[in-house]
Curated annotation (Swiss-Prot):
Protein name per its UniProtKB record: Alpha-enolase
Keywords: Acetylation, Cell membrane, Cytoplasm, Glycolysis, Hydroxylation, Isopeptide bond, Lyase, Magnesium, Membrane, Metal-binding, Phosphoprotein, Plasminogen activation, Ubl conjugation
GO cellular component, one term: cytoplasm
InterPro entries: Enolase (IPR000941), Enolase-like_C_sf (IPR036849), Enolase-like_N (IPR029017), Enolase_C (IPR020810), Enolase_CS (IPR020809), Enolase_N (IPR020811)
Catalytic residues (UniProt): 210, 343
Region (Required for interaction with PLG) residue spans: 405-434
One of the GO BP terms on file: glycolytic process
Main location group: cytoplasm
Highest classification ranks of the organism: Eukaryota, Metazoa, Chordata, Craniata, Vertebrata
Required co-factors: Mg(2+)
Amino acid sequence: MSILKVHAREIFDSRGNPTVEVDLFTAKGLFRAAVPSGASTGIYEALELRDNDKTRYMGKGVSKAVEHINKTIAPALVSKKLNVVEQEKIDKLMIEMDGTENKSKFGANAILGVSLAVCKAGAVEKGVPLYRHIADLAGNAEVILPVPAFNVINGGSHAGNKLAMQEFMILPVGAENFREAMRIGAEVYHNLKNVIKEKYGKDATNVGDEGGFAPNILENKEALELLKNAIGKAGYSDKVVIGMDVAASEFYRSGKYDLDFKSPDDPSRYITPDELANLYKSFIRDYPVVSIEDPFDQDDWEAWQKFTASAGIQVVGDDLTVTNPKRIAKAVSEKSCNCLLLKVNQIGSVTESLQACKLAQSNGWGVMVSHRSGETEDTFIADLVVGLCTGQIKTVAPCRSERLAKYNQILRIEEELGSKAKFAGRSFRNPLAK
């Protein structure tokens, strides 16, 4: 079924910034997709086109991206009469029309908005759920429900506290199914709220951009201690493990790292990559830490490689790999990490996201599907994570409805699959292993 009409508009994300929404019409109806955006962005990401008109939305408007869709992409897709099930063909056409390495002509936010809407339309055209259509596009015969990684303590660029490391997460790997994982996550979250309130006062339980708490602590170890405490109080010490997203590029200073980067600059307190690696190893020794994302700067390749070889845990590349097949290939050959963080808006199309995922999986890596800090009510990544069988999803604390929208969609998928539902559980790093 061909595309009859495409119309884009500016809407708002969860931080009150404009973002792109696309309506795509076929004879089967209307298909709508909205594009997320990130706060800590890697320098190798596809370009998110903003207007930079300071008189409007502090320069963050996306009217140019919207115009590229309405005036250029839409007429091309309608006139070519492409079938919406031909995801790769449509994505390729948009990428070729853009003609730049990083999608800077139309903007990755323009191309992705259309790409997501096409994918939703393709599923209905085939008469299958979106997760099944995505599984077909990826060549997966089965689908798997992921372990949720709840980011419950926020620091770094996401929070106004002193904490350098950006995210402290809980993963309920011992749950029987996704619904139980959600219950465990919610109960630990509420216990954590009480633990923080008792120790730091009620105002320490205000939530950040991503629904997590941002108590004013400086020591990263203190965040782990709070988590351990809350997990124990909830009664789930045997079922919940911990993950971290350090986002170390944010505090990388000329070859070293500044764990107090939100205070006035003082080079005497910077630490070396080796000292930082030893700090991580002490966390792994003293707490159930099983996954660390972006432990070093996006260009500190040597530190990544040394750490991945010796840490014995999941090491996730986000700023390092930015969902970009070229960066992933380099990281694979250098053994820099062993898990890809998959963000559809870092690369800017469904087809390239699937390629990045398959490239990582075929090299024995894990893959974690992720939201962005500026989210919308769009639930595409819920179906994506199930269809791609990655076994793990990061869309933050069980708080704020733009986050819960994703979790609730996975609950519905689990219910729909019934007895066929498979939950990744403790195999979250490689759920397809036989």
